[in-house]
Amino acid sequence: MSILTRIFGSRNERVLRKLKKQVVKINKMEPAFEALSDDELKAKTQEFRDRLSGGETLQQILPEAFATVREASKRVLGMRHFDVQLIGGMVLTNRCIAEMRTGEGKTLTATLPCYLIALEGKGVHVVTVNDYLARRDAETNRPLFEFLGMSVGVNIPGLSPEEKREAYAADITYATNSELGFDYLRDNLAHSKEERFQRTLGYALVDEVDSILIDEARTPLIISGQAEKSSELYIAVNKLIPSLIKQEKEDTEEYQGEGDFTLDLKSKQAHLTERGQEKVEDWLIAQGLMPEGDSLYSPSRIVLLHHVMAALRAHTLFEKDVDYIVKDGEIVIVDEHTGRTMAGRRWSDGLHQAIEAKEGVDIKSENQTVASISYQNYFRLYERLAGMTGTADTEAFEFQQIYGLETVVIPTNRPMIRDDRTDVMFENEQYKFNAIIEDIKDCVERQQPVLVGTISVEKSEELSKALDKAGIKHNVLNAKFHQQEAEIVAEAGFPSAVTIATNMAGRGTDIILGGNWKAQAAKLENPTQEQIEALKAEWEKNHEIVMKAGGLHIIGTERHESRRIDNQLRGRSGRQGDPGSSRFYLSLEDGLMRIYLNEGKRNLMRKAFTVAGEAMESKMLAKVIASAQAKVEAFHFDGRKNLLEYDDVANDQRHAIYEQRNYLLDNDDISETINAIRHDVFNGVIDQYIPPQSLEEQWDIKGLEERLSQEFGMELPISNWLEEDNNLHEESLRERIVEIAEKEYKEKEALVGEDAMHHFEKGVMLQTLDELWKEHLASMDYLRQGIHLRGYAQKDPKQEYKKESFRMFTEMLDSLKHHVIMTLTRVRVRTQEEMEEAELARQEMATRINQNNLPVDENSQTTQNSETEDYSDRRIGRNEPCPCGSGKKYKHCHGSRVARQ
């Protein structure tokens, strides 16, 4: 600690000192607000809105607004905000993250900034990690907000468009992070402004902010459409992979391995060795999937390479019951950070299809990206962003670097007395499990509840089997049993209760010591007051037993890659000053040790075990683990930062496209834009054949005539003009062509009317923009996947990506203009009279065909009249005119239909 820090305190301490002065001010107001009637308290909301309209700022009315919410909460919810919750609320009104320990009342704290900022009328979004928490928090706080005249909405998956609009129109909207992101993308795929859901992105308060902005940062939100189906190739390649042999180290000049592939467990990537490439190519040639003499890495075989690498990753890097589960014939992803299943989500780049082939389930079609955005870039769209969590301080640097959010650690209301014991290390997993079971037995005997945290479904099931063998009754909470989550968490605080859980362990819900009597009461049908009192009495008795036993005991079965996830597990115990304890049991076979500790360090630690089953407990161990976790966190931070740098390039382009789309949706008349585009397009085409400031001998007039005819349907005798008029030069010729194009377009507009033409222009522009943007996204994906190869040419891949993507984007915009003008110029406008004539002719044709027993072609139109003839007694020749009167040969008209039938 520096001398300055000792004198002035840390940055966090200085911030808290400043905020405590505001708390004193709010507390002094409490008696005056207690004296207000309900109506007077409710009237404060309109008073604050009027004062904001009059020029006051949110910070000026903050003390009174917080005092209003505190008093309303006492009357409506029966809960009074603690001073530390007021501090948390003030932190959240700024661009800050409040780190509040588990059980400190984050849900109630959130009511303070939400009420204050909702007074502006721009809408407030409270973001949660799942729909259960969104519904729960909204229903908990709804009575308070409605008492104060604020409307509350809930936006979760499965709502109708009307329900969504109603939710977004509310003053305060509770929503899941994924639904907010997808709605943003849907809004930017809408074809009318009425179809959009979201209004201005004003203020987002993100609950469990570390989970959403850190853990989910690498997960892009993608809306996709179906692309081509290639399940046969996935099935074929799937048969190849089991024959490939893993090589432990990559080839070097000194070491030439004999394996077929190497694995990078940190980045979850697989690479073929030269031997592996030859083996794969021989197999593909033998199967007839690749011609002899060709290479897997040739440009024409990129699809095959894509399938092989996806299958290799699926078999070697993604484990069943760790990374995914198989449920109802589908592959369901398991979130590595929370342990929850993510229904509806699919891995990209063919990985999901490769895993479906591996597990023998139905292979669904690959998808083509229609719209995408990362959580990092979505949440940076908000004018104000804040967040709260129990574990943010370890990621404070990243929050500041990426989002510009300062982290403030809020003190607990009561001192934390949990006993965090030192980690113990074992030589292998079996010895570790034996020690864990002994610890659990000890707790059960003393009637202390135990929560055992595992890092995967697979490990939770292994430990469950070991406990069954030991005769210890327990519950398992993992991705396979997530439906029972609320029930299992409610029982986890009972005396002697043993709960095995993955990282999902009731995040967002508290484990109450002695059990949750309210959850028990909810199971009863119309419980009587007598039954409720009995449940309360039973809870008080159990609560006392658990408190004497030492509170909730946490056992970690291995360290997670992130310290934050470990702290979350520990944070389930010791809430609001309750007693509790925690300990992590580790082995040299754990993933963290295996991947991030080199062989030398592991061998050194292995030598420290002299007796079988011996536990190692030392300060050196803590340093080794801290070092390994720091490496992982730095690795993942670099990955997220790298992803953001690439996504920022696409983000700038996304902004430009979505801005253009919103302009189109908000304006019914875009004729000025169309006129400007038409001018640009025709001048661009003319420049290609009549270069500026060139001699007439250099002009390609024939080429220009053909181009104007083919692409724009304009038959212009430019050669004749030049012969007839010697004074016609480059500029005047250009003006004449553009004038004729504009004149012909105006004539079309006069035929159908301005309104109809404006509607058509808007539709063509939107449809073309969406189609080209979709193709551009696919091109950007391909560019991103291969850009790292530029590094071999001593070029910076990021700079190359920026240059290439800018060039592609410019080309897309030019293509957009060209396609729009080409469509609008070539389209043939039909008058009402022509349409009526065509309909009459169609009816006459139908009558003739019915008389001759020929199938009707609804799409053919005719204006010819021909004598009706009875063809029933003779065969119609293939080259004879079709009797329908279309003028086509029979084989090209109804003859082809008859042949098909």
Curated annotation (Swiss-Prot):
Q: How is the cofactor bound?
A: May bind 1 zinc ion per subunit.
Q: What is one GO biological process annotated to this record? A: intracellular protein transmembrane transport
Q: Which gene encodes it?
A: secA
List ligand-binding residues for ATP.
Q85, G103, E104, G105, K106, T107, D510
Regions of compositional bias (Basic residues) in chain numbering:
888-901
Q: Where in the cell is it found?
A: Cell inner membrane; Cytoplasm
- UniProt KW keywords: ATP-binding, Cell inner membrane, Cell membrane, Cytoplasm, Membrane, Metal-binding, Nucleotide-binding, Protein transport, Translocase, Translocation, Transport, Zinc
What HAMAP family does the record tag this protein with?
A: SecA
Report what the protein is called: Protein translocase subunit SecA
